[in-house]
């Protein structure tokens, strides 16, 4: 009897593995994704193909990295998701002549009506938060230079001027797309009239992360975010950046690689679950690469896999709870928690219980395998993109072996128990001629924006502006 049951459990697990095998990517698959990513990057950089390229390769006008001589107080704003952060950054000489960066910050959550109302409502709310922060720190009387981390696709015309191309991540505030974001912020500050600010720089969160990590390690020339969304930036040779005049030196390019796949480059790798996630998203047909990796989508992918296993009578005796059938019910943090389970399955059992399920031991094991399959594919897909960037940098610099540091931020990278190990191992397999160091950014977005502002202020002083 026991043997029969054991055989049935083994057969069930084997069927589960057959279904989950769809998520496995072979090294040849990853090399294919990497080569296609490089081709799209090239198209994004070139003037004649930029418009139709899915990977936009947006110039950021960040050319210099901090040298350690900029000092002063800077205000930093960070808008990239449902939370908005205001930070005071003091850049100065530390002990023994070292450079020191001290920060104080406060988080504000953005109400739904500000995210989806008008641009005026959104930026009025942001300036209200700045006003509140300055009151708390008794700094209303000071006109501070301000660095703005704005983590949406922007076409820069200068370091302090950028046109919002399109909202992502659930934002829909009308009247912002096609307009200068810094102008919208300046107008809102003017409307309030109770404080003055000098907006000197606007950067993407990947750029802010790279600059913040450069402060720790001067070989950091790539910034990457794996959180709600997924994106990367890197220092490109100016001669390859056709959208900006000049051939000397390097400029940081914001790849906006989340949109890779929007022209069909990933079609052969998309599964039924991916198509369902895409169809029910706020932007169907867009940001397809990001939807395979980002935390906004990972939990939902797992939920759809679990429903398939229920329908195949391989999980929960073929019956799903009402909660499990509800879109968004299986949160991405559950994926991390399930994979963090120590082996007694308590954590998995508790999560499934909150979803109205009474799982068996085998159910718990199957749910864990589903989570591992989805998150491992995410790590491997992400590795193909980064390997594409790094191999490109090595080739354009004609280096036999390139040493490089990548600064990384984002909740999936930082909080998932195995993502970074799987990701690092896969990147290294795909970049055999590179020695890569990964560092995690601390308060990256805010500190990085302030350091970019410090560079901009120093330049302005040198130019006598």
UniProtKB/Swiss-Prot annotation:
Keyword set includes Transferase: yes
Annotated effect of mutating residue 226 to M: In MODY2; no effect on stability; decreased glucokinase activity; decreased affinity for glucose
EC number assigned by the record: 2.7.1.1
Effect after changing residue 393 to T: In PNDM1; decreased stability; increased glucokinase activity; no effect on affinity for glucose
Residue numbers binding ATP: 78-83, 228, 295-296, 332-336, 411-415
Main subcellular localisation: cytoplasm
Top-rank taxon, per record: Eukaryota
Regulation of its activity: Subject to allosteric regulation. Low glucose and high fructose-6-phosphate triggers association with the inhibitor GCKR followed by sequestration in the nucleus.
Alphabetic keyword roster: Allosteric enzyme, ATP-binding, Cytoplasm, Diabetes mellitus, Disease variant, Glycolysis, Kinase, Mitochondrion, Nucleotide-binding, Nucleus, Transferase
Region of interest (Hexokinase small subdomain), residue spans: 67-203
Resulting phenotype, residue 210 to K: In MODY2 and PNDM1
Influence of pH: Optimum pH is 6-8 with glucose as substrate. Optimum pH is 9-10 with glucosamine as substrate.
UniProt-reported outcome of changing residue 420 to E: In MODY2; no effect on glucokinase activity; decreased affinity for glucose; no effect on affinity for ATP
Enzyme class: transferase
Family membership noted in the UniProt record: Belongs to the hexokinase family.
Protein's name in the database: Hexokinase-4
Natural source organism: Homo sapiens (Human)
Lineage per the UniProt record: Eukaryota, Metazoa, Chordata, Craniata, Vertebrata
């Amino acid at each position: 009897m026991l043997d029969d049951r054991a055989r049935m459990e083994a057969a069930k697990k084997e069927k589960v593995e057959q279904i989950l095998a769809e998520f496995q990517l072979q090294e040849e698959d990853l090399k294919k994704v990497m080569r296609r990513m490089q081709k799209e990057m090239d198209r994004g950089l070139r003037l004649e193909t930029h418009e139709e390229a899915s990977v936009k390769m947006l110039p950021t006008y960040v050319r210099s990295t901090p040298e350690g001589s900029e000092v002063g107080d800077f205000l930093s704003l960070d808008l990239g998701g449902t939370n908005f952060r205001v930070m005071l950054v003091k850049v100065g000489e530390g002990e023994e002549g070292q450079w020191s960066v001290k920060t104080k910050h406060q988080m504000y959550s953005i109400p739904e009506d500000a995210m989806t109302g008008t641009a005026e409502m959104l930026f009025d709310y942001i300036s209200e938060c700045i006003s509140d922060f300055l009151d708390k720190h008794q700094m209303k009387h000071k006109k501070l230079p301000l660095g703005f981390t704005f983590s949406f696709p922007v076409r820069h015309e200068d370091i302090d001027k950028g046109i919002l191309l399109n909202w992502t991540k659930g934002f829909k505030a009308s009247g912002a797309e096609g307009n200068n974001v810094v102008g919208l912020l300046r107008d809102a500050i003017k409307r309030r009239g109770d404080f003055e600010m000098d907006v000197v720089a606007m950067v993407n969160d990947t750029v802010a992360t790279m600059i913040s990590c450069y402060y720790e390690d001067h070989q950091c020339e790539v910034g990457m975010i794996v959180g709600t969304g997924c994106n990367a930036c890197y220092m490109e040779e100016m001669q390859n950046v056709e959208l900006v005049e000049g051939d000397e030196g390097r400029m940081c390019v914001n790849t906006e690689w989340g949109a890779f796949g929007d022209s069909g480059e990933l079609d052969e790798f998309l599964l039924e679950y991916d198509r369902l996630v895409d169809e029910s998203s706020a932007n169907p047909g867009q940001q397809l690469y990001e939807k395979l990796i980002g935390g906004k989508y990972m939990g939902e992918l797992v939920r759809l896999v679990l429903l398939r296993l229920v329908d195949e009578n391989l999980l929960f005796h073929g019956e799903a709870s009402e909660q499990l059938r509800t879109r968004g019910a299986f949160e991405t943090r559950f994926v991390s928690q399930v994979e963090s389970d120590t082996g007694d399955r308590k954590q998995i059992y508790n999560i499934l219980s909150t979803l109205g399920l009474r799982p068996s031991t085998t159910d718990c094991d199957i749910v864990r395998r589903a989570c591992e399959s989805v998150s491992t594919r995410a790590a491997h897909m992400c590795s193909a993109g980064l390997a594409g960037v790094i191999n490109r940098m090595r080739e354009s610099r004609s280096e036999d072996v390139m040493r490089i540091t990548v600064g990384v931020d984002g909740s999936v990278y930082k909080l998932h128990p195995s993502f970074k190990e799987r990701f690092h191992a896969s990147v290294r397999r795909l970049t055999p001629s590179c020695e890569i160091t990964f560092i995690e950014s601390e308060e990256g977005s805010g500190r990085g924006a302030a350091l970019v502002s410090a560079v901009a202020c120093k330049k302005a002083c040198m130019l006598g502006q």
